[in-house]
């Protein structure tokens, strides 16, 4: 049997403003009765006050270093300058005290119990709406590994991201026998009026 205490939903807050979204993620998971731990990664620029508020709703608040794609040209073209620090989610692979994690962006809203995502294999993700050959890293099933973390960092430093997000940063699995490079998830994607993406999981 699977030890559910060794599995976690993970989100991330790189600013005080993102703490509000992360809190909404945690509350929506608890509202629908998740049996897994709920973890938030925060960067040093998140204030102590915000971190204390996160401890009220999360099981763990983990401090990580800020990574930045520094791809200002593509970020400007996409009109998404806030995406620069999204490489920070690569630190999910350092959470090796968990056997499996499901990463949810801070703009994700859970609308039912989604614990079944832990039955999925690494690397499960949804196709990116704008780039179907790549995956969108807003909802991602992964197995923490220090070695994978090292490889992802090396890949990010060497290749960066063609759109400023991590969707293209992770080296995709080799495709063999006609198989997918990654396991596809289905979820509804609805842009907010502000043009920021939000992921609604049914």
Would you name each region that the model predicts?
Residues 1-71:
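N-terminal anchoring/stem segment of glycosyltransferases
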Residues 28, 118-122, 158:
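Glycine-rich, phosphate-binding/catalytic loops in enzymes
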Residues 62-75, 85-150:
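GT-A fold catalytic core of metal-dependent nucleotide-sugar glycosyltransferases
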Residues 29, 93, 107, 140, ...:
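A residue-level signal for conserved active-site and pocket-lining positions in enzyme catalytic cores
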């Amino acid at each position: 049997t699977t030890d559910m205490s060794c599995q976690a939903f993970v989100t991330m807050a790189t600013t005080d403003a993102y703490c509000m979204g992360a809190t909404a993620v945690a509350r929506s998971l608890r509202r629908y009765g998740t049996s897994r731990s709920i973890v938030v990664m925060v960067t040093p620029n998140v204030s102590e006050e915000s971190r204390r508020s996160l401890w009220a709703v999360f099981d763990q608040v983990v401090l990580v270093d800020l990574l930045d794609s520094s791809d200002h040209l593509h970020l400007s073209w996409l009109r998404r300058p806030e995406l620069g620090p999204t490489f920070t989610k690569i630190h999910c692979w350092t959470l090796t005290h968990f056997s499996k994690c499901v990463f949810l962006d801070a703009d994700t809203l859970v609308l039912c119990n989604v614990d079944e995502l832990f039955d999925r294999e690494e690397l499960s993700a949804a196709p990116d709406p704008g780039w179907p050959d790549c995956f969108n890293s807003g909802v991602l099933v992964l197995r923490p590994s220090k070695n994978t973390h090292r490889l992802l960092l090396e890949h990010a430093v060497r290749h960066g991201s063609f759109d400023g997000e991590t969707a293209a940063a992770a080296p995709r699995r080799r495709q063999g026998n006609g198989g997918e490079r990654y396991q596809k998830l289905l979820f509804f994607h609805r842009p907010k009026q502000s043009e920021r993406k939000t992921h609604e999981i049914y």
